[in-house]
Amino acid sequence: MSLGRGKYDFYIGLGLAMTSSIFIGGSFILKKKGLLRLARKGSMRAGQGGHAYLKEWLWWAGLLSMGAGEVANFAAYAFAPATLVTPLGALSVLVSAILSSYFLNERLNLHGKIGCLLSILGSTVMVIHAPKEEEIETLNEMSHKLGDPGFVVFATFVVIVALIFIFVVGPRHGQTNILVYITICSVIGAFSVSCVKGLGIAIKELLAGKPVLQHPLAWILLFSLVVCVSTQINYLNRALDIFNTSIVTPIYYVFFTTSVLTCSAILFKEWQDMPVDDVIGTLSGFFTIIVGIFLLHAFKDVSFSLASLPVSFRKDEKAMNGNLSSMYEVLNNNEDDLPCGIEHTGENISRRNGNLPSF
């Protein structure tokens, strides 16, 4: 592949990945609006087993939006490296959070706004440093990569881990440990992304007039994708049903993306020719997104704004009028009026907080 063509495909994949995030993030808002309209009409809610949402056009608009987003995401893997496309999936969470604050009147606190900003910055860093060229262009090359000893060892290890978690660890600890079902989804997800990548290459070859349907690998990838996605959906739904969504979402994003990046590094060798600064930049962007997603979800139910900051961090209007500027000064002035015993108690409290008094 020529350098110019590689960059052209890279930007097509980037555009498709970002478009996918917008459609998927917006789909949650449309479906939620439709469900809220049904609730106001007194219809039986979906959580109670009702299916009135099938008659609500907003819900269908959300479903079509999600379908369009998934198609765009599928196509993005055919043009851009998985190292770029998979982490950018976090932007759908960002889009959903921003739109919900405007259209669903769901308040986005200070932690959420900082998380959104960090996610944008992390995504930008990843786009700048991600590999620009594709290593695989045909199914024959894909077949050769799948037979690489390094990937065979990795795939065998992943299958063994998945089977152990499904049949041994899951039945015993799946109801109490959040990492069990998420681990199953994540390690299987590494295979599903590889299958999508291979099928994307097959579609490109098919459009070019090549006899792809006669290639057995195309059908193997399709069958593997169906099995992997079915398994992912099954165990992800179990995790969401048992544990809090605000905890499942960021942990799943971290585990899933890490699995995909590891698989891509071994199978497609996208990191092999990357300079050290690009590797560091890509990892830095990824960890920045992780922090942003964590802030966005972990503190979403906490009422916190700029007005909640400590008094010493904000401008005190009383200080301008010659009055005391902080609670510290109030406590400091009252210290002389405290009995000796209370002073020692204060020292003990200070010591428990890690601040030893001077002697």
UniProtKB/Swiss-Prot annotation:
InterPro entries: Mg_trans_NIPA (IPR008521)
Tissue/organ expression: Widely expressed. Expressed at high levels in the kidney.
Superkingdom of origin: Eukaryota
Keywords: Cell membrane, Endosome, Ion transport, Magnesium, Membrane, Transmembrane, Transmembrane helix, Transport
Pfam families: Mg_trans_NIPA
Induction notes from the record: Up-regulated by low magnesium ion levels.
Function in brief: Acts as a selective Mg(2+) transporter.
Main location: membrane
Presence of keyword Transport: yes
Gene it is expressed from: Nipa2
Residues in the Cytoplasmic compartment per record: 31-56, 100-107, 171-175, 237-246, 300-359
SUPFAM superfamilies assigned: Multidrug resistance efflux transporter EmrE (SSF103481)
Membrane topology according to the record: Multi-pass membrane protein
Protein name: Magnesium transporter NIPA2
Entry GO terms, CC: early endosome; plasma membrane
GO MF: magnesium ion transmembrane transporter activity
Provenance organism: Mus musculus (Mouse)
